[in-house]
Amino acid sequence: MKKTMIALLATLLLVACGQSYEETKRITRQQRREAARKDSAALKIAVLPTLDCLPLFVAQQEQLLDTLNGGVRLKMYQAQMDCDTALERHRVEGMVTDLVRAMRLNDKGTKIRYMAVTGAYWQLIANRLSRIRQIKQLNDKMIGMTRFSATDLLSKRVADSVKLNEEHLFKIQLNSLNVRMQMLQNNEIDAVWLTEPQATMARLYKHPVIFDSRSTGLQLGVIAFREQEMRRQARGHQLQLLVEAYNKACDLINEKGVKHYKKLIMDRCQVRAAVVDSLPSDLRFEHARGPRQQDMEEVRGKKDEVRSMK
């Protein structure tokens, strides 16, 4: 009798455990479906640890994006090419990038809608131990950059400005901003293209600036979305609300100053307090608008120039 009772209790325990396990699996499946539904409804934007993304970071922190149906998710990447891939493979609907890369994606078949022009600029920073102080000294030197990007176009500009044969300018593809900084610090490269706040970090380490893209007058930073996705009514409405939130964030930054968001920049861009303290004090952020025709023509002209050389 005692053995029978033990066996019965063991059977009941196994059944209870089995039900609990099946119930857990069912709940987990429901949670996964719900998470996937929310992710699908959210407007996903690929961002980088750079200052041109600050209005988006501020909009998120100040809860300006909460009015968007489905919400907004900022997905951090370390390289522009990874943002491109995420957009092409429909992992995100939009990205912070540059006009060269956006126009190239558009030409390849991923039609683009521009939301904003950012205040991004790039500085060509030489290794302080390389003794490079002028552009003309770049002959047979290695420059860290990203192919088919603003830094590629600017490298051509730099070479043309001193009639330097571009074949003697060794453009090394370093997509990750962190890798560029590490190679500069480890004296493994002669010069690199950097945007803020990484450019300020390099200057703090006494690496000299030999070219600044602002001298060209070009405005190449953009926030772009997949046109096909934005044609959907729900997405189009989300984009309208995003523009409103973005503009409010720009106003907040311009009113309070970039350094007011010191902790946010340190967290998102992974830089020290000293870097934020040393950022230029005149940084301003414009309301959302499309790229200028002259900038698009410049990018298109350089592309045609490259094709004619092949």
Residue ranges and their predicted role:
Residues 21-165, 171, 183, 190-196, ...:
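Short, glycine-/small- and polar/acidic-enriched structural segments
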Residues 2-8:
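Sec-dependent signal peptide recognition
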Residues 129-136, 154-155, 159-161, 166-170, ...:
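Proline/Glycine/Serine-rich low-complexity intrinsically disordered segments
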Residues 15-16:
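C-terminal motif of bacterial Sec signal peptides marking the signal peptidase cleavage site
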Residues 11-12:
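Repetitive helical segments and hydrophobic/amphipathic motifs
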